[in-house]
From Swiss-Prot:
The active site is at H191 (tele-phosphohistidine intermediate), C506 (proton donor). Keywords: Cytoplasm, Kinase, Magnesium, Metal-binding, Phosphotransferase system, Sugar transport, Transferase, Transport. The keyword Transport applies. It comes from the Bacteria. NCBIfam families: PTS_I_fam. It catalyses: L-histidyl-[protein] + phosphoenolpyruvate = N(pros)-phospho-L-histidyl-[protein] + pyruvate. This is Phosphoenolpyruvate-protein phosphotransferase. The keyword Magnesium applies. GO terms for cellular component: cytoplasm. It is an enzyme of class 2 (transferase). Mg(2+) binds at E435, D459.
Length: 575
């Protein structure tokens, strides 16, 4: 008899296949006394080396199949493995207490995990606890000679079922064989869900009990569009899901026909659909999906993929490659956004209780520590500007004083290059990322001095709602459609237009099919998203009338008190 479970729709698509249970191995061990502590330390070093090699391979594969943005999660894991303080404490534990490496590892990592988890009001520390837990599990497996699940070995069509999928699990999924995945826990903004959308694998998370209900080999029918899973579907249900899968495949084929088309609404208004990228390699996805621009080039990956500060020439070559690759189409380059969850092994930053609200991004660039890095980046960008349509964007701007200071450095380096006889473009737009509520509220003042705005909704929502989207205990407050968020976005768009400037968006909300009608109605000029969302969004835009969507946005802003009311109104206007 079939049974239906409801979960969170995390990645679109429909699939019917047998279940493959991703079961975690038994990593239990006995604490033992040892005489040869040097031998135990050597065992630990071997396990660390194997873990590093594995994670580096997984990271490289993730960068290739998912892009640098999704691969960066593994940088935090690699930094845990090379943390001299933690590794030193484990070895000291072996030496002082004459215990086996397994026991020393568990004692030290449990101490760190407990310490970070105790800071339950600090999302950054919660994430560090999760990183250490994942890495400790991998090291322990090597110490015990136990093989961790390897999803990359799956060689038949299956639907992966797990309590949760770590980023390393998800990055190893081969979409040739893995038709979908379903988990007990997780949310739409979890790392595994974001990776699933990049891989274009249907996914449902947060079912609470899928692993209790399913056995290996059970047939599952998954609809990642609405969040339904049927266990052991009847022939009729199976046929229905297979028909839905075909309909979805046909729909995707229709979207593919729009690859070379401009994005035009039902009433003839052109809207720019751009892509977010992390490296020049990501341009392949932009072209494959018909991107009209690069709306966000995350330059921090140049720094994160290097063992030392990238030189001016290294940066120039990367920026040149992207600008030339886009053949005159706009490229918005975000200056270095280091700090928060993005650390560099060769840049020592002060320890902070909450790095997300601390010393990061433009705050580093404008400091004595970051001045040289920032000026080098400005020179590389200015030199590359002659190869395409460059736009420069400063992240984490809270005050006009910060923008003016950054713009002054840009002008200073530009003049130096001109004096050196180096050709630079005189048509470079300079704008800011709106991700701090203070900047959104003062958008009318900023608009007089910037050339454009790009709304970074991921952080804007977190900072406005005081809720970390990766923290499941408060994730219900991560509300892109909360009227307060919509009002801030509308304020930014109106402020830009009042000064004859353009406003874009580069957060996940820009590619959200529920948000697009609202944002179009508010007058957003540019939507920048994961490249895989572009064709679907272009198809939606073709069906939307800007006058009708403006009415929708106006009503949402004036009449709605809650996120649920906004949802209902959007459904009324788009059904």
């Amino acid at each position: 008899m079939s049974e239906m479970l409801k979960g969170i729709a995390a990645s679109d698509g429909v699939a019917v296949a047998k279940a493959y249970l991703l079961v975690q191995p038994d990593l239990s061990f006995n604490k033992t006394s040892v005489e040869d502590t040097d031998a135990e330390a050597t065992r630990l070093d071997d396990a660390l080396a194997k873990s590093t090699e594995e994670l580096q391979a997984i990271r490289d594969k993730a960068a290739q199949s998912l892009g640098e943005a999704e691969a960066q999660v593994f940088d935090a894991h690699l930094m845990v493995l090379s943390d001299p303080e933690m590794v030193g404490q484990i070895k000291q534990n072996i030496q002082d207490n004459k215990v086996n490496a397994e026991a020393a590892l568990k004692e030290v990592t449990d101490m760190y995990i407990g310490m970070f988890e105790a800071m339950d009001d600090n999302a950054y520390m919660q994430e560090r606890a999760a990183d250490i837990r994942d890495v400790a599990k991998r090291i322990l497996a090597h110490l015990l000679g136990v093989t961790l699940p390897n999803p990359s070995m799956i060689n038949e069509e299956v639907i992966v079922v797990a309590h949760d999928l770590t980023p390393s699990d998800t990055a190893q999924l081969d979409r040739t064989y893995v038709k979908a995945f379903v988990t007990d826990i997780g949310g739409r903004t979890s790392h595994s869900a974001i990776m699933a959308r990049s891989l274009e694998i249907p996914a449902i998370v947060g079912t609470k009990e899928i692993t209790d209900k399913v056995k290996a080999g059970d047939i599952l029918a998954v609809n990642g569009i609405i969040g339904d899973v049927i266990i052991d579907p009847t022939d009729a249900e199976k046929s229905e899901f297979e028909a839905e899968a075909k309909a979805y495949a046909d729909q995707k084929a229709e979207w593919d026909k729009l690859k070379n088309a401009e994005t035009v609404t039902a009433d003839g208004k052109h809207v720019e659909l751009a892509a977010n990228i992390g490296t020049p390699k990501d341009l392949e996805g932009v072209h494959k999906n018909g991107g009209e621009a690069v709306g966000l080039y995350r330059t921090e990956f140049l720094y994160m993929d290097s063992s030392d500060f990238p030189t001016e020439e290294d940066q120039y070559q990367a920026y040149k490659a992207v600008l030339e690759g886009m053949e005159g189409k706009p490229v918005v380059v975000r200056t270095m956004d280091i700090g928060g969850d993005k650390e560099l092994p060769y840049l020592t930053l002060p320890h902070e209780m909450n790095p997300f609200l601390g010393y990061r991004a433009l705050r580093i660039s404008l400091s004595e520590l970051g001045d040289g890095m920032f000026r080098t980046q400005m020179r590389a960008l200015l030199r590359a500007s002659v190869h395409g349509n460059l736009r420069i964007m400063f992240p984490m701007v809270a005050t006009l004083k910060e923008f003016r200071a950054a713009k002054a450095i840009f002008e200073d380096e530009k003049q130096k290059l001109v004096n050196e006889g180096v050709e630079v473009s005189n048509d470079i737009q300079v704008g800011i990322m709106i991700e701090i509520p203070a900047a959104a509220v003062l958008a009318d003042k900023f608009a007089k001095e910037v050339d454009f705005f790009s709304v970074g909704t991921n952080d804007l929502i977190q900072y406005t709602m005081a809720a970390d989207r990766m923290n499941e205990r408060v994730s219900y407050l991560y509300q892109p459609y909360n009227p307060s968020i919509l009002r801030l976005i509308k304020n930014v768009i109106d402020a830009a237009h009042a000064e004859g400037k353009w406003a874009g968006m580069c957060g996940e909300m820009a590619g959200d099919q529920t948000a697009v009608p609202l944002l179009l109605g508010m007058g957003l000029d540019e939507f920048s998203m994961s490249a895989t969302s572009i064709l679907k969004t272009r198809s939606l835009m073709k069906r939307l009338d800007t006058t009708k969507m403006a009415e929708l946005a106006d009503r949402a802003l004036k009449e709605c008190d809650t996120m649920e009311e906004v949802f209902a109104l959007v459904e009324e206007y788009t059904k």
